[in-house]
Amino acid sequence: MTHPRAIAGIVGVLLSVISMAVGAAGQGDARGADLIVPHESWSCGLPDGIPRPEGGTLVFEAEMTLDRVADIGRTQYGQRQVAVVQGGTLTGTRVNGSVMTGALDFELTLANGVIEVEQIYVLRTSDGRYVYVRAAGTGADAKDVRLVMDFEAPTASDIAWLNAGTYVGRRVLNATSRTMTLRVYDVSAAKPAAGSRQAVRITKPAGVPPQPWDYRKAAPIEKRGNQLITETVTLSPSQSVGPSKRGPRNIIPITGGELTGRIAGKVLPGGADYQNLSPPATIDARYLWQTADGEIIIVRNGGAFGSLVPTFEVRVESSYAWLNTGTYLSSNPEMRPGGVGLTFFESTR
Protein backbone atom coordinates (compact mmCIF):
# COMPACT_ATOMS: atom_id res chain seq x y z
CA MET A 1 0.00 0.00 0.00
CA THR A 2 1.36 3.41 -0.99
CA HIS A 3 1.98 5.75 1.94
CA PRO A 4 -0.25 8.93 1.92
CA ARG A 5 2.83 11.17 1.97
CA ALA A 6 4.13 9.42 -1.14
CA ILE A 7 0.80 9.96 -2.87
CA ALA A 8 0.89 13.63 -1.92
CA GLY A 9 4.38 13.91 -3.34
CA ILE A 10 3.34 12.34 -6.64
CA VAL A 11 0.34 14.66 -6.88
CA GLY A 12 2.59 17.65 -6.22
CA VAL A 13 4.93 16.64 -9.04
CA LEU A 14 2.00 16.19 -11.43
CA LEU A 15 0.59 19.59 -10.54
CA SER A 16 3.98 21.16 -11.15
CA VAL A 17 4.16 19.57 -14.59
CA ILE A 18 0.64 20.74 -15.43
CA SER A 19 1.40 24.27 -14.31
CA MET A 20 4.29 24.35 -16.77
CA ALA A 21 1.76 23.89 -19.58
CA VAL A 22 -0.89 26.37 -18.46
CA GLY A 23 -0.04 28.96 -15.83
CA ALA A 24 -1.85 31.92 -14.38
CA ALA A 25 -0.49 35.36 -13.72
CA GLY A 26 0.51 35.65 -10.10
CA GLN A 27 0.93 31.88 -9.78
CA GLY A 28 3.99 31.26 -11.92
CA ASP A 29 6.79 32.75 -13.95
CA ALA A 30 5.82 33.65 -17.53
CA ARG A 31 9.39 33.81 -18.80
CA GLY A 32 9.96 31.40 -21.67
CA ALA A 33 6.26 30.64 -22.14
CA ASP A 34 5.28 30.02 -25.74
CA LEU A 35 2.22 32.20 -25.32
CA ILE A 36 0.88 34.83 -22.97
CA VAL A 37 -2.91 34.73 -23.16
CA PRO A 38 -4.22 38.23 -22.41
CA HIS A 39 -7.15 38.94 -20.15
CA GLU A 40 -10.31 39.38 -22.20
CA SER A 41 -10.61 43.02 -21.10
CA TRP A 42 -7.19 43.85 -22.63
CA SER A 43 -6.86 41.39 -25.51
CA CYS A 44 -4.05 43.27 -27.30
CA GLY A 45 -5.44 42.20 -30.66
CA LEU A 46 -4.25 38.61 -30.07
CA PRO A 47 -6.82 37.13 -27.66
CA ASP A 48 -5.64 33.56 -28.27
CA GLY A 49 -2.11 34.33 -27.14
CA ILE A 50 0.91 36.56 -27.73
CA PRO A 51 3.97 34.56 -28.86
CA ARG A 52 7.51 35.21 -27.70
CA PRO A 53 8.77 38.03 -29.94
CA GLU A 54 12.26 36.54 -30.14
CA GLY A 55 10.74 33.52 -31.92
CA GLY A 56 10.17 35.71 -34.96
CA THR A 57 12.34 37.82 -37.26
CA LEU A 58 13.67 41.17 -36.06
CA VAL A 59 12.09 44.00 -38.06
CA PHE A 60 13.59 47.04 -36.37
CA GLU A 61 15.03 48.42 -33.17
CA ALA A 62 14.16 51.86 -31.80
CA GLU A 63 16.38 53.67 -29.31
CA MET A 64 14.60 56.54 -27.59
CA THR A 65 15.30 59.25 -25.07
CA LEU A 66 12.47 60.26 -22.75
CA ASP A 67 11.38 63.79 -21.96
CA ARG A 68 9.72 62.68 -18.74
CA VAL A 69 8.54 59.63 -16.83
CA ALA A 70 5.55 60.57 -14.69
CA ASP A 71 4.47 58.37 -11.80
CA ILE A 72 0.78 59.20 -11.71
CA GLY A 73 0.08 56.98 -8.69
CA ARG A 74 -2.90 54.71 -8.10
CA THR A 75 -5.75 55.61 -10.43
CA GLN A 76 -9.15 53.98 -10.90
CA TYR A 77 -7.47 51.28 -13.03
CA GLY A 78 -4.29 50.52 -11.06
CA GLN A 79 -0.80 51.94 -10.54
CA ARG A 80 -0.11 54.22 -13.51
CA GLN A 81 3.10 55.49 -15.09
CA VAL A 82 3.36 57.57 -18.26
CA ALA A 83 6.51 58.15 -20.32
CA VAL A 84 6.78 60.88 -22.95
CA VAL A 85 9.33 60.33 -25.73
CA GLN A 86 11.68 63.15 -26.64
CA GLY A 87 12.84 61.44 -29.84
CA GLY A 88 14.67 58.42 -31.13
CA THR A 89 16.26 56.49 -33.97
CA LEU A 90 14.89 53.54 -35.90
CA THR A 91 17.17 50.94 -37.50
CA GLY A 92 16.29 47.76 -39.35
CA THR A 93 16.94 45.72 -42.46
CA ARG A 94 13.82 46.99 -44.27
CA VAL A 95 12.97 50.23 -42.50
CA ASN A 96 15.07 53.03 -41.00
CA GLY A 97 14.22 56.46 -39.69
CA SER A 98 13.27 58.21 -36.47
CA VAL A 99 10.73 58.20 -33.66
CA MET A 100 8.95 61.54 -33.56
CA THR A 101 8.80 63.69 -30.45
CA GLY A 102 5.76 63.21 -28.22
CA ALA A 103 5.21 59.44 -28.39
CA LEU A 104 3.42 58.11 -25.29
CA ASP A 105 3.94 54.98 -23.20
CA PHE A 106 1.17 54.21 -20.69
CA GLU A 107 2.07 51.49 -18.17
CA LEU A 108 -0.45 50.04 -15.72
CA THR A 109 0.51 47.73 -12.84
CA LEU A 110 -2.26 45.76 -11.13
CA ALA A 111 -2.31 44.55 -7.53
CA ASN A 112 -1.36 40.99 -8.57
CA GLY A 113 1.70 42.20 -10.50
CA VAL A 114 0.15 42.03 -13.97
CA ILE A 115 1.41 44.70 -16.38
CA GLU A 116 -0.60 46.33 -19.16
CA VAL A 117 0.97 48.74 -21.63
CA GLU A 118 -0.35 51.02 -24.35
CA GLN A 119 2.00 52.88 -26.67
CA ILE A 120 1.29 55.49 -29.33
CA TYR A 121 4.05 56.45 -31.77
CA VAL A 122 4.63 58.29 -34.98
CA LEU A 123 7.60 57.02 -36.99
CA ARG A 124 9.26 58.87 -39.85
CA THR A 125 11.15 56.76 -42.35
CA SER A 126 14.43 57.85 -43.88
CA ASP A 127 12.59 58.84 -47.08
CA GLY A 128 10.15 61.08 -45.20
CA ARG A 129 7.04 58.90 -44.85
CA TYR A 130 5.06 58.85 -41.61
CA VAL A 131 3.75 55.70 -39.92
CA TYR A 132 1.18 55.74 -37.12
CA VAL A 133 1.74 53.05 -34.50
CA ARG A 134 -0.47 51.93 -31.64
CA ALA A 135 0.56 49.00 -29.47
CA ALA A 136 -1.07 47.06 -26.65
CA GLY A 137 0.88 44.75 -24.38
CA THR A 138 0.65 42.68 -21.25
CA GLY A 139 2.63 40.37 -19.02
CA ALA A 140 2.25 38.39 -15.82
CA ASP A 141 4.94 40.64 -14.38
CA ALA A 142 7.60 43.08 -15.52
CA LYS A 143 9.97 40.25 -16.53
CA ASP A 144 8.03 39.30 -19.67
CA VAL A 145 5.87 42.04 -21.18
CA ARG A 146 4.95 41.54 -24.83
CA LEU A 147 3.61 44.31 -27.06
CA VAL A 148 1.39 43.66 -30.07
CA MET A 149 2.23 46.33 -32.62
CA ASP A 150 -0.31 47.78 -35.06
CA PHE A 151 1.02 49.89 -37.92
CA GLU A 152 -0.77 52.28 -40.25
CA ALA A 153 1.64 52.93 -43.10
CA PRO A 154 0.89 54.68 -46.40
CA THR A 155 -0.74 52.17 -48.73
CA ALA A 156 1.06 53.66 -51.75
CA SER A 157 4.58 53.19 -50.41
CA ASP A 158 7.36 50.64 -50.16
CA ILE A 159 6.58 50.16 -46.44
CA ALA A 160 2.93 49.17 -46.99
CA TRP A 161 3.93 45.65 -45.89
CA LEU A 162 3.76 46.96 -42.31
CA ASN A 163 -0.04 47.07 -42.68
CA ALA A 164 -0.19 43.27 -42.81
CA GLY A 165 1.36 40.52 -40.71
CA THR A 166 1.69 40.03 -36.96
CA TYR A 167 4.31 41.99 -35.04
CA VAL A 168 5.28 41.66 -31.39
CA GLY A 169 7.68 43.93 -29.55
CA ARG A 170 9.79 43.92 -26.43
CA ARG A 171 10.49 47.20 -24.65
CA VAL A 172 13.03 48.11 -21.98
CA LEU A 173 12.23 51.36 -20.16
CA ASN A 174 14.78 52.86 -17.80
CA ALA A 175 13.18 55.67 -15.80
CA THR A 176 16.48 56.63 -14.18
CA SER A 177 18.38 57.20 -17.43
CA ARG A 178 15.23 58.28 -19.26
CA THR A 179 15.77 55.87 -22.12
CA MET A 180 13.63 53.26 -23.80
CA THR A 181 14.51 50.53 -26.28
CA LEU A 182 11.92 48.80 -28.43
CA ARG A 183 12.66 45.73 -30.54
CA VAL A 184 9.91 44.63 -32.92
CA TYR A 185 9.72 41.16 -34.47
CA ASP A 186 7.61 39.69 -37.26
CA VAL A 187 6.00 36.62 -35.69
CA SER A 188 3.61 35.86 -38.56
CA ALA A 189 5.33 32.53 -39.20
CA ALA A 190 6.60 31.86 -35.68
CA LYS A 191 5.83 28.46 -34.15
CA PRO A 192 6.07 27.56 -30.45
CA ALA A 193 9.29 25.74 -29.63
CA ALA A 194 8.87 22.01 -29.08
CA GLY A 195 8.97 20.97 -25.44
CA SER A 196 8.69 24.47 -23.95
CA ARG A 197 5.94 25.74 -21.70
CA GLN A 198 2.74 26.36 -23.60
CA ALA A 199 0.81 29.30 -22.13
CA VAL A 200 0.47 31.68 -19.23
CA ARG A 201 -3.00 33.16 -18.78
CA ILE A 202 -3.35 36.67 -17.47
CA THR A 203 -5.72 37.12 -14.53
CA LYS A 204 -6.89 40.31 -12.86
CA PRO A 205 -7.90 41.24 -9.32
CA ALA A 206 -11.64 41.30 -8.73
CA GLY A 207 -13.44 44.61 -8.43
CA VAL A 208 -11.04 46.70 -10.50
CA PRO A 209 -12.53 48.31 -13.64
CA PRO A 210 -10.63 47.52 -16.84
CA GLN A 211 -8.87 50.35 -18.61
CA PRO A 212 -10.61 51.18 -21.91
CA TRP A 213 -9.05 50.72 -25.32
CA ASP A 214 -11.51 53.01 -27.09
CA TYR A 215 -12.75 56.46 -26.12
CA ARG A 216 -16.15 56.91 -24.48
CA LYS A 217 -19.05 57.68 -26.80
CA ALA A 218 -21.82 60.01 -25.69
CA ALA A 219 -25.38 58.74 -25.45
CA PRO A 220 -27.91 60.51 -27.71
CA ILE A 221 -29.70 62.01 -24.70
CA GLU A 222 -26.57 63.65 -23.24
CA LYS A 223 -26.33 67.42 -23.36
CA ARG A 224 -23.97 70.08 -22.09
CA GLY A 225 -24.34 71.20 -18.50
CA ASN A 226 -22.14 73.49 -16.44
CA GLN A 227 -18.93 74.73 -18.01
CA LEU A 228 -15.97 72.95 -16.44
CA ILE A 229 -12.65 73.89 -18.02
CA THR A 230 -11.35 75.96 -20.90
CA GLU A 231 -8.04 74.98 -22.46
CA THR A 232 -5.81 76.38 -25.14
CA VAL A 233 -3.54 73.85 -26.83
CA THR A 234 -0.48 74.72 -28.91
CA LEU A 235 0.28 72.46 -31.86
CA SER A 236 3.06 71.51 -34.26
CA PRO A 237 2.56 71.07 -38.02
CA SER A 238 0.61 68.01 -39.11
CA GLN A 239 2.25 64.66 -39.75
CA SER A 240 0.20 63.11 -42.54
CA VAL A 241 0.31 59.36 -43.14
CA GLY A 242 -2.19 59.70 -45.97
CA PRO A 243 -4.41 56.81 -47.09
CA SER A 244 -3.77 53.69 -45.02
CA LYS A 245 -5.53 50.50 -43.99
CA ARG A 246 -8.13 52.31 -41.83
CA GLY A 247 -8.46 55.38 -44.01
CA PRO A 248 -6.51 58.65 -44.24
CA ARG A 249 -4.57 59.23 -41.02
CA ASN A 250 -3.32 62.61 -39.83
CA ILE A 251 -1.50 63.46 -36.60
CA ILE A 252 -1.16 66.93 -35.04
CA PRO A 253 1.43 66.92 -32.21
CA ILE A 254 0.63 68.74 -28.96
CA THR A 255 3.39 71.06 -27.72
CA GLY A 256 1.82 72.74 -24.67
CA GLY A 257 -0.95 75.04 -23.54
CA GLU A 258 -2.87 76.19 -20.48
CA LEU A 259 -6.18 75.52 -18.75
CA THR A 260 -8.48 77.65 -16.66
CA GLY A 261 -11.76 77.17 -14.86
CA ARG A 262 -12.46 74.60 -12.17
CA ILE A 263 -8.89 73.38 -12.70
CA ALA A 264 -5.96 75.69 -13.40
CA GLY A 265 -2.70 74.50 -14.86
CA LYS A 266 -0.95 73.72 -18.11
CA VAL A 267 -0.98 71.28 -21.00
CA LEU A 268 2.29 69.36 -21.07
CA PRO A 269 4.21 68.80 -24.32
CA GLY A 270 3.58 65.31 -25.67
CA GLY A 271 0.84 63.30 -27.28
CA ALA A 272 -1.20 64.48 -30.23
CA ASP A 273 -4.54 64.78 -31.90
CA TYR A 274 -4.71 61.49 -33.81
CA GLN A 275 -7.19 61.99 -36.64
CA ASN A 276 -8.88 59.51 -38.94
CA LEU A 277 -10.24 61.50 -41.86
CA SER A 278 -12.56 58.81 -43.25
CA PRO A 279 -16.14 60.18 -43.19
CA PRO A 280 -17.28 60.94 -40.59
CA ALA A 281 -13.88 62.23 -39.50
CA THR A 282 -12.93 61.38 -35.91
CA ILE A 283 -10.25 62.53 -33.53
CA ASP A 284 -8.65 60.79 -30.57
CA ALA A 285 -6.53 63.31 -28.67
CA ARG A 286 -4.22 61.86 -26.01
CA TYR A 287 -2.18 64.13 -23.73
CA LEU A 288 -1.38 65.25 -20.17
CA TRP A 289 -2.32 68.11 -17.90
CA GLN A 290 -0.31 69.36 -14.96
CA THR A 291 -2.35 71.28 -12.40
CA ALA A 292 -1.09 74.40 -10.64
CA ASP A 293 -0.32 72.27 -7.57
CA GLY A 294 1.62 69.64 -9.54
CA GLU A 295 -0.88 66.82 -10.13
CA ILE A 296 -0.56 64.97 -13.47
CA ILE A 297 -3.86 64.14 -15.19
CA ILE A 298 -4.22 61.89 -18.24
CA VAL A 299 -6.63 63.39 -20.78
CA ARG A 300 -8.39 61.75 -23.69
CA ASN A 301 -10.83 63.60 -25.95
CA GLY A 302 -12.32 61.59 -28.76
CA GLY A 303 -15.19 61.19 -31.17
CA ALA A 304 -16.64 62.73 -34.28
CA PHE A 305 -16.81 66.49 -34.65
CA GLY A 306 -19.91 67.70 -32.84
CA SER A 307 -19.86 64.83 -30.35
CA LEU A 308 -16.45 64.92 -28.67
CA VAL A 309 -16.19 63.27 -25.26
CA PRO A 310 -13.32 63.88 -22.81
CA THR A 311 -12.33 61.35 -20.15
CA PHE A 312 -9.72 61.58 -17.42
CA GLU A 313 -7.44 59.43 -15.29
CA VAL A 314 -5.93 60.81 -12.11
CA ARG A 315 -4.64 59.61 -8.76
CA VAL A 316 -7.56 58.43 -6.60
CA GLU A 317 -6.20 60.13 -3.47
CA SER A 318 -5.91 63.51 -5.19
CA SER A 319 -8.31 66.43 -4.90
CA TYR A 320 -9.14 65.92 -8.59
CA ALA A 321 -10.35 62.33 -8.25
CA TRP A 322 -13.88 63.46 -9.10
CA LEU A 323 -12.71 63.57 -12.71
CA ASN A 324 -12.45 59.77 -12.70
CA THR A 325 -16.15 59.19 -12.09
CA GLY A 326 -17.91 62.07 -13.86
CA THR A 327 -19.14 62.26 -17.44
CA TYR A 328 -18.22 65.19 -19.64
CA LEU A 329 -18.67 66.67 -23.10
CA SER A 330 -16.35 68.81 -25.21
CA SER A 331 -16.78 71.61 -27.70
CA ASN A 332 -15.25 71.30 -31.12
CA PRO A 333 -11.73 72.73 -31.35
CA GLU A 334 -11.68 76.40 -32.36
CA MET A 335 -8.67 77.80 -34.16
CA ARG A 336 -6.40 80.02 -32.07
CA PRO A 337 -2.96 81.50 -32.85
CA GLY A 338 -0.56 78.55 -32.83
CA GLY A 339 -3.20 76.01 -31.89
CA VAL A 340 -6.80 75.48 -30.80
CA GLY A 341 -9.14 76.24 -27.93
CA LEU A 342 -11.65 73.85 -26.35
CA THR A 343 -14.23 74.01 -23.59
CA PHE A 344 -15.24 71.03 -21.46
CA PHE A 345 -18.68 70.73 -19.87
CA GLU A 346 -20.39 68.49 -17.36
CA SER A 347 -22.77 66.08 -19.09
CA THR A 348 -26.45 66.07 -18.17
CA ARG A 349 -29.44 64.07 -19.36
PLM regions with names:
Residues 31-349:
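Beta-strand-enriched cores of mature, soluble protein domains
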Residues 21-32:
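Signal peptide processing junction and immediate N-terminal pro/mature segment
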Residues 9-19:
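Bacterial N-terminal signal peptides
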Residues 1-11:
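Bacterial N-terminal signal peptides that target proteins for export
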